[in-house]
Amino acid sequence: MLKKIFIKTFGCQMNEYDSNRIFDTVKKIGFEKTEKYEDANCYLLNTCHIRDKAKEKVYHEIGRVKKIFREKKKPIVVVAGCVAQAENQEMLKREPYIDIVIGPQSYHKINEAILNHLKNKKKEEETEFDTISKFNYLSQIKNKDSKVSSFLTIQEGCDKFCHFCVVPYTRGPEYSRPFDQIINEAKELVQSGAKEIILLGQNVNAYSYDEEGKKYRLSDLLIKLDSFDKLERIRYTTSHPKDMTDDLINVYKTSSKLMPLVHLPVQSGSNKILNLMNRKHTIEEYLLVYEKLRKINPKIEFSSDFIIGYPEEDEQDFKMTMELIEKVKFINSYSFIFSPRPGTVAANLTLVDQKKSKQRLEIIQEKLFNNQIKKNKSLENKILNVLVENKMKDGIKLFGRTEYMTSVIFDGNIENIGKLVQVEIISSNQNSLFGKLTESSKKKVA
């Protein structure tokens, strides 16, 4: 009988990529994927440790699984990802229902862990930083993720050690995959139907790989991918302002496939706070990158991340953040109240009054919300290029994205999926655009 695995993924796009590759791996020992908890022989939770209460989410999910399988045979329970890396021994002690914990740099060993557990009925723990072995192994397994828009990890870990961040401790130091390994996986994705590839890394623009005296950087990868005939779009995330080098910026001038949306987290508009965060750049340096990019390609827009209520943030610091938002006019951003992560420098700092932090968060989110509304409203009555990704749940409308990652919903034929079409925008809200196929796009399908 074929074994079934249920995979639930929390957190970033890299976790989504990891979950896909975990499934590619466990297929080798006979697993197929199920979307139903109750059918699973193996339940895997791929976790994120960035936000507050990450551990408690894990225990809550395990509690749900316990209830479902109260009168059924217990599945193998695997906790993977960054929470597993950070809390491995504690998790195994606190929750006996967990059978295996496996860190993000060890999931190539998941088959061995599962088979050992089945044989010995003992808890298994794999949490070594073994990034080279992981990617060498994964390069031998075909990436079956054939979505129209597909993720591709090129770099992992971080050496920046921002004082609020757990990534250096859960993902390890910066590691860049071999250039040819990435290109080969990209070719597989395109051959499987991918029209857009999103390059991933905790610090993706720090990508640097030396081979026989040749140093490859992110710009080299982008230029190579730009030459793929059947690939329509290229994106990358997440970037650090310090690594936004001139060679990378110049690709925005020459590439027709690199999308004009740059996700460039800044976290705060105050140099005082950036210094306390150990961000290793100033607002002036951030704005210089912004100006260079806009000069190279005036179509470029920006999105960002903001941490509100970081220790010692005062009204003047917050005002500077609001001024930065007004200047750059980010079209999409993520903002959160600071939550201390165990093991980081900031975990030991005095918190800003939570009432003040919540008030500031409401103000900044309203500003960012209005920016999005204004941007989307400006697109009404315009014709946009949309990459069609899938059909909506109603089975009638189609879903796609613009160059700026904005969702577009419209009536269309399923034969449009995977194609670039032109859509006339009729209306909008904060998150989405609504439109209709142009006559020329209808004729192409017909």
From Swiss-Prot:
Its cofactor is [4Fe-4S] cluster. It catalyses: N(6)-dimethylallyladenosine(37) in tRNA + (sulfur carrier)-SH + AH2 + 2 S-adenosyl-L-methionine = 2-methylsulfanyl-N(6)-dimethylallyladenosine(37) in tRNA + (sulfur carrier)-H + 5'-deoxyadenosine + L-methionine + A + S-adenosyl-L-homocysteine + 2 H(+). Residues 377-439 form the TRAM domain. [4Fe-4S] cluster 2 binds at C158, C162, C165. Residues 3-119 form the MTTase N-terminal domain. Monomer. Residues 144-374 form the Radical SAM core domain. This is tRNA-2-methylthio-N(6)-dimethylallyladenosine synthase.
